[in-house]
Swiss-Prot record:
Subcellular location: Plastid, Chloroplast thylakoid membrane
Keywords noted in UniProt: Chloroplast, Membrane, Photosynthesis, Plastid, Repeat, Thylakoid, TPR repeat
TPR repeats: 35-68, 72-105, 120-153
Protein role: Essential for the assembly of the photosystem I (PSI) complex. May act as a chaperone-like factor to guide the assembly of the PSI subunits.
Name of the gene: ycf3
Superkingdom of origin: Eukaryota
One of the protein's GO biological processes: photosynthesis
An example Gene Ontology CC term for this record: chloroplast thylakoid membrane
Name of the protein: Photosystem I assembly protein Ycf3
Family: Belongs to the Ycf3 family.
Gene3D superfamilies documented for this protein: Tetratricopeptide repeat domain
Main localisation: plastid
Topology of this chain in the membrane: Peripheral membrane protein
Annotated organism of origin: Chaetosphaeridium globosum (Charophycean green alga)
């Protein structure tokens, strides 16, 4: 049974019903509907922490989906899973792929910045301040790009940029 038919919580059920109605009403191909179904099941599995199942669904959605904009969100969600699993290098790769298809994803820039900032903190703990500065500079670059797309978001990042003197650079 597809995951979308066994959702237990109200929000997932509501999303599934609305998505099913939209799929019936909006003229789309069978392939597009199937891709969206896998994407929807991937989101459901991801929200429940079932990352392996979510990845399987996202990979199937990627196999079927041809629209670059829609693919960007699939790639972004794959990046989220790799971030959650601590696979930061893989996550960065998927976020970059998402941005190649849709450069207007501030959340991808933010997540890449968070990973870079984390790596900077790790470098400090390892006694490598030069490497830490490079990671922090990269984080700043990503945050600036995300903030440019969503100026009212990422207030903590904006404050960090101001405090560290990286806002104007």
């Amino acid at each position: 049974m597809p995951r979308s038919q066994r959702n237990d919580n109200f929000i997932d059920k509501t999303f599934t019903v609305v998505a099913d109605i939209l799929l019936r009403v909006i003229p789309t191909t069978r392939r597009e509907k199937e891709a969206f179904s896998y994407y929807r099941d991937g989101m459901s599995a991801q929200s429940e922490g079932e990352y392996a199942e979510a990845l399987q669904n996202y990979y199937e959605a990627m196999r079927l989906e041809i629209d670059p904009y829609d693919r960007s969100y699939i790639l972004y969600n794959i990046g989220l899973i790799h971030t959650s699993n601590g696979q930061h290098t893989k996550a960065l790769e998927y976020y970059l792929q998402a941005l190649e298809r849709n450069p207007a994803l501030p959340q991808a820039f933010n997540n890449m910045a968070v990973i870079c900032h984390y790596r900077g903190e790790q470098a400090i703990q390892q006694g490598d301040p030069e490497n830490a500065e490079a990671w922090f500079d990269q984080a700043a670059d990503y945050w600036k790009q995300g903030i440019a797309l969503a100026p009212s978001n990422y207030i903590e990042a904006q404050n960090w940029l101001k405090i560290t003197g990286r806002l104007k650079a």
